[in-house]
Amino acid sequence: MPHVEAITLTRDRRGPGLGAVRLWLYAVAALIIAMVVVGGATRLTESGLSITEWKPVTGALPPLSQADWQAEFDKYQAIPQYEILNKGMGLEAFKRIYWWEWGHRLLGRLIGFAFLLPFLWFAWRGVLRGRLLAKCLVLFLLGGLQGAVGWWMVASGLTARVSVSQYRLAIHLTLACIILSAIVAVARSLSPEPRQVVGGRLRATAWALVALVLVQIFAGGLVAGLDAGMAFNTWPLMDGHLIPPAAQLAAADPFWRNLFENALTVQFNHRMIAYALWTLTLLHALDARRAGGAVAQRAWVLFALVTAQASLGILTLIHQVPIDLALAHQFGATLVLVVATLHLGGLSGQVEPATPKLRLVKG
């Protein structure tokens, strides 16, 4: 009679439809990267305040007539940015900045549909269920929150300011990147590629790298919001100092305001975090040599990307933030984050519960 000879536990992530889910999530991640870059262009061209209202539905249509364009221009002329920075701007010049902001918002709507419609389809077909369904639902809700945060950011520049709050800009950028990392992590967890078991220290530093990249992205958002990259355009010295005088770093009172509002301190922090990230990535790659194989390869690829990103940041700084270098630097940040997330997923990503496989032998 047949009896059970052996039980083998496998981690099966090749269930029906999961490959399509993985491709869908990676496609949405690519759209988010495009959104971050377009958002950077919108900021660098000072286009972000050209649309002064938030209309999630009707705002999808651009002005269709001369009267519509004039109405939008009239609204822009009523805010401080026009009065202080762009007084005398003509309608054609306004159209150029309007299209950047409109395109940024349109891409946000596209991402929403690109996520929601396949999500509903996969859920209806039963491909998304259990923890995977819950994760995707959380991702969708985070996307909705990101849209609201975007308007919250824009609204900060429609009152007495001529630009958006650096606090809100940094939050908006960082939340986009958190969503990007989360989507990539979920997609990676569905890969049939096996994970390599490594020591706790290597896993811990992989987690730390993802966290530190996000901290650096937040710091970069503060630099962008304060236009801090337009000053102190030398490297490795800042205004002739490797470490600026304490009186300048702590010029504002109370001290914590310097961390967010003092352009010198904000740029200095961005530099110091970059050095820390580069050092940690190098140490992690050296540690990964003992694991060998794909783990070591990914760690060294990540180190190369961090090195390239730091070099690009230096070039952007010393050339006083030209738009092409600035956008490449922003794209590089998302690329580093994606690779760090994929690397972490290859070490300790979430997997589906083990499925027992029984082999029956006649006896």
Swiss-Prot record:
- Transmembrane stretches, by residue range? 18-38, 107-127, 137-157, 167-187, 206-226, 264-286, 299-319, 325-345
Q: Which reaction does it catalyse?
A: Fe(II)-heme o + 2 A + H2O = Fe(II)-heme a + 2 AH2
Instruction: Give EC number(s), comma-separated.
Output: 1.17.99.9
Topologically, how does it sit relative to the membrane? Multi-pass membrane protein
User: What are the record's GO terms for cellular component?
Assistant: plasma membrane
Task: Sum up the protein's function in the record's words.
Answer: Catalyzes the conversion of heme O to heme A by two successive hydroxylations of the methyl group at C8. The first hydroxylation forms heme I, the second hydroxylation results in an unstable dihydroxymethyl group, which spontaneously dehydrates, resulting in the formyl group of heme A.
Query: What's this protein's family per the entry?
Result: Belongs to the COX15/CtaA family. Type 2 subfamily.
UniProt protein name = Heme A synthase
